[in-house]
Amino acid sequence: MQQNIIKIKVGSKNPVKINAATKAMAQLFPDSIIDASGMDAPSGVAAQPMTDKDTRQGAINRVHYCQQQDQQDTQADYYFAMEGGVDCFDFGPATFAYIAIGHKDQLAIGRSAILPLPMQVYRALEAGEELGHVMDRLFNTVNIKQKGGAIGLLTHGHATRESNYTQAIILAMAPLLNPDIYAQTC
Protein backbone atom coordinates (compact mmCIF):
# COMPACT_ATOMS: atom_id res chain seq x y z
CA MET A 1 0.00 0.00 0.00
CA GLN A 2 1.44 3.34 -1.09
CA GLN A 3 1.40 6.15 1.45
CA ASN A 4 0.09 9.56 0.48
CA ILE A 5 2.75 12.27 0.42
CA ILE A 6 1.76 15.71 1.69
CA LYS A 7 4.16 18.41 0.57
CA ILE A 8 4.41 21.41 2.90
CA LYS A 9 6.42 24.60 2.63
CA VAL A 10 7.25 26.78 5.63
CA GLY A 11 7.98 30.49 5.26
CA SER A 12 11.20 30.21 7.25
CA LYS A 13 14.36 28.14 7.36
CA ASN A 14 14.23 28.11 11.17
CA PRO A 15 14.26 24.43 12.19
CA VAL A 16 11.84 25.10 15.08
CA LYS A 17 9.18 26.32 12.65
CA ILE A 18 9.78 23.56 10.10
CA ASN A 19 9.67 20.90 12.83
CA ALA A 20 6.48 22.35 14.33
CA ALA A 21 4.69 22.27 10.97
CA THR A 22 5.95 18.76 10.27
CA LYS A 23 4.87 17.43 13.69
CA ALA A 24 1.45 19.07 13.47
CA MET A 25 0.77 17.62 10.04
CA ALA A 26 2.05 14.18 11.09
CA GLN A 27 -0.44 14.24 13.98
CA LEU A 28 -3.30 15.32 11.71
CA PHE A 29 -2.41 12.92 8.89
CA PRO A 30 -0.76 9.91 10.59
CA ASP A 31 -1.04 7.70 7.51
CA SER A 32 0.75 10.19 5.25
CA ILE A 33 4.38 11.03 4.66
CA ILE A 34 5.07 14.70 5.34
CA ASP A 35 7.60 16.21 2.92
CA ALA A 36 8.59 19.53 4.50
CA SER A 37 10.89 22.28 3.34
CA GLY A 38 11.53 25.85 4.38
CA MET A 39 12.27 28.99 2.47
CA ASP A 40 13.16 32.52 3.45
CA ALA A 41 10.02 34.63 3.21
CA PRO A 42 9.80 38.32 4.08
CA SER A 43 7.22 39.32 6.65
CA GLY A 44 6.81 42.88 5.44
CA VAL A 45 6.62 44.02 9.07
CA ALA A 46 9.25 44.94 11.65
CA ALA A 47 11.76 42.25 12.63
CA GLN A 48 10.11 42.32 16.06
CA PRO A 49 6.39 43.02 15.59
CA MET A 50 5.07 45.00 18.55
CA THR A 51 1.33 44.66 17.96
CA ASP A 52 -1.18 41.89 17.47
CA LYS A 53 -2.15 43.37 14.09
CA ASP A 54 1.42 43.56 12.74
CA THR A 55 2.19 40.03 13.93
CA ARG A 56 -0.87 38.65 12.13
CA GLN A 57 -0.02 40.56 8.96
CA GLY A 58 3.55 39.26 9.02
CA ALA A 59 2.33 35.65 9.02
CA ILE A 60 -0.11 36.33 6.17
CA ASN A 61 2.58 38.10 4.12
CA ARG A 62 4.97 35.16 4.53
CA VAL A 63 2.36 32.62 3.36
CA HIS A 64 1.42 34.71 0.33
CA TYR A 65 5.09 35.10 -0.58
CA CYS A 66 5.65 31.34 -0.43
CA GLN A 67 2.60 30.69 -2.59
CA GLN A 68 3.73 33.25 -5.18
CA GLN A 69 7.27 31.86 -5.33
CA ASP A 70 6.01 28.31 -5.63
CA GLN A 71 3.98 29.06 -8.74
CA GLN A 72 7.20 28.87 -10.72
CA ASP A 73 8.28 25.63 -9.04
CA THR A 74 6.38 22.58 -7.92
CA GLN A 75 3.55 23.56 -5.65
CA ALA A 76 3.13 22.43 -2.08
CA ASP A 77 -0.14 21.10 -0.69
CA TYR A 78 0.05 23.44 2.32
CA TYR A 79 1.99 26.61 3.11
CA PHE A 80 2.77 27.64 6.68
CA ALA A 81 4.01 30.81 8.30
CA MET A 82 4.57 31.53 11.96
CA GLU A 83 5.17 35.10 13.06
CA GLY A 84 6.13 35.79 16.65
CA GLY A 85 5.22 39.12 18.17
CA VAL A 86 4.53 40.99 21.37
CA ASP A 87 1.91 43.40 22.60
CA CYS A 88 1.02 45.10 25.85
CA PHE A 89 -2.37 43.96 27.09
CA ASP A 90 -4.45 45.08 30.10
CA PHE A 91 -2.68 42.43 32.18
CA GLY A 92 0.81 43.36 30.94
CA PRO A 93 3.16 42.54 28.07
CA ALA A 94 3.08 39.12 26.41
CA THR A 95 4.48 37.29 23.44
CA PHE A 96 2.52 35.07 21.05
CA ALA A 97 2.60 33.89 17.46
CA TYR A 98 0.21 34.02 14.57
CA ILE A 99 -0.10 31.07 12.26
CA ALA A 100 -1.13 31.47 8.63
CA ILE A 101 -1.85 28.40 6.51
CA GLY A 102 -2.46 28.46 2.78
CA HIS A 103 -4.14 25.51 1.09
CA LYS A 104 -5.36 25.86 -2.50
CA ASP A 105 -7.40 29.08 -2.46
CA GLN A 106 -8.03 28.98 1.30
CA LEU A 107 -6.27 30.89 4.06
CA ALA A 108 -6.57 29.78 7.68
CA ILE A 109 -5.37 31.94 10.56
CA GLY A 110 -4.68 30.97 14.15
CA ARG A 111 -2.90 32.35 17.17
CA SER A 112 -0.83 30.59 19.78
CA ALA A 113 -1.19 30.75 23.51
CA ILE A 114 0.35 33.85 25.04
CA LEU A 115 3.33 34.00 27.35
CA PRO A 116 3.49 36.89 29.82
CA LEU A 117 6.79 38.76 29.57
CA PRO A 118 8.77 40.49 32.31
CA MET A 119 8.57 44.28 31.97
CA GLN A 120 12.36 44.53 31.57
CA VAL A 121 12.12 42.30 28.49
CA TYR A 122 9.27 44.34 27.03
CA ARG A 123 11.19 47.60 27.57
CA ALA A 124 14.16 46.19 25.63
CA LEU A 125 11.80 45.24 22.81
CA GLU A 126 10.34 48.75 22.80
CA ALA A 127 13.92 50.02 22.43
CA GLY A 128 14.27 48.02 19.20
CA GLU A 129 15.74 44.69 20.24
CA GLU A 130 14.38 41.30 19.12
CA LEU A 131 13.00 38.91 21.73
CA GLY A 132 15.53 36.15 20.98
CA HIS A 133 18.47 38.51 21.51
CA VAL A 134 17.02 39.88 24.75
CA MET A 135 16.45 36.36 26.09
CA ASP A 136 19.95 35.26 25.04
CA ARG A 137 21.42 38.16 27.00
CA LEU A 138 19.17 37.67 30.04
CA PHE A 139 19.72 33.89 30.29
CA ASN A 140 23.24 33.71 28.82
CA THR A 141 22.12 31.51 25.91
CA VAL A 142 22.99 31.51 22.22
CA ASN A 143 20.39 31.62 19.42
CA ILE A 144 17.54 30.51 21.70
CA LYS A 145 14.99 31.36 19.00
CA GLN A 146 16.11 28.28 17.07
CA LYS A 147 15.79 26.16 20.20
CA GLY A 148 13.23 26.35 23.03
CA GLY A 149 12.69 30.09 22.66
CA ALA A 150 11.55 32.48 25.37
CA ILE A 151 8.79 29.99 26.12
CA GLY A 152 11.27 27.26 27.00
CA LEU A 153 13.35 29.57 29.15
CA LEU A 154 10.47 31.15 31.08
CA THR A 155 8.60 27.86 31.65
CA HIS A 156 11.78 25.98 32.65
CA GLY A 157 11.38 23.73 29.62
CA HIS A 158 7.81 22.61 30.35
CA ALA A 159 6.73 24.19 27.07
CA THR A 160 8.81 25.28 24.09
CA ARG A 161 8.50 27.52 21.09
CA GLU A 162 8.05 24.40 18.95
CA SER A 163 5.33 22.86 21.14
CA ASN A 164 3.45 26.17 21.17
CA TYR A 165 3.64 26.44 17.36
CA THR A 166 2.62 22.80 16.90
CA GLN A 167 -0.53 23.24 18.98
CA ALA A 168 -1.41 26.52 17.26
CA ILE A 169 -1.00 24.93 13.81
CA ILE A 170 -3.29 22.04 14.72
CA LEU A 171 -5.97 24.47 15.92
CA ALA A 172 -5.56 26.73 12.87
CA MET A 173 -6.06 23.70 10.60
CA ALA A 174 -9.67 23.19 11.82
CA PRO A 175 -11.29 25.20 8.98
CA LEU A 176 -9.22 23.33 6.39
CA LEU A 177 -10.12 19.96 7.90
CA ASN A 178 -13.83 20.85 8.03
CA PRO A 179 -14.45 23.23 5.12
CA ASP A 180 -18.20 22.59 4.92
CA ILE A 181 -18.96 23.86 8.39
CA TYR A 182 -16.52 26.80 8.16
CA ALA A 183 -17.92 28.14 4.88
CA GLN A 184 -19.31 31.30 6.50
CA THR A 185 -17.30 33.92 8.33
CA CYS A 186 -18.41 36.72 10.64
From Swiss-Prot:
Gene Ontology BP annotations: nucleotide metabolic process; thiamine metabolic process
Binding site for Mg(2+): 75
Manner of cofactor binding, per the entry note: Binds 1 divalent metal cation per subunit; can use either Mg(2+) or Mn(2+).
Molecular-function GO terms, alphabetical: ITPase activity; metal ion binding; nucleotide binding; ribonucleoside triphosphate phosphatase activity
Names of required cofactors: Mg(2+); Mn(2+)
Keywords associated with the record: Hydrolase, Magnesium, Manganese, Metal-binding, Nucleotide metabolism, Nucleotide-binding
E.C. code: 3.6.1.73
Catalytic activity from the UniProt record: XTP + H2O = XDP + phosphate + H(+); ITP + H2O = IDP + phosphate + H(+)
Pfam annotation, one family: NTPase_I-T
Function, as annotated: Phosphatase that hydrolyzes non-canonical purine nucleotides such as XTP and ITP to their respective diphosphate derivatives. Probably excludes non-canonical purines from DNA/RNA precursor pool, thus preventing their incorporation into DNA/RNA and avoiding chromosomal lesions.
Family recorded in the similarity comment: Belongs to the YjjX NTPase family.
HAMAP family (alphabetical): Non_canon_purine_NTPase_YjjX
Assembly and interaction partners: Homodimer.
Designated name of the protein: Inosine/xanthosine triphosphatase
Annotated organism of origin: Shewanella baltica (strain OS185)
Upper lineage: Bacteria, Pseudomonadati, Pseudomonadota, Gammaproteobacteria, Alteromonadales
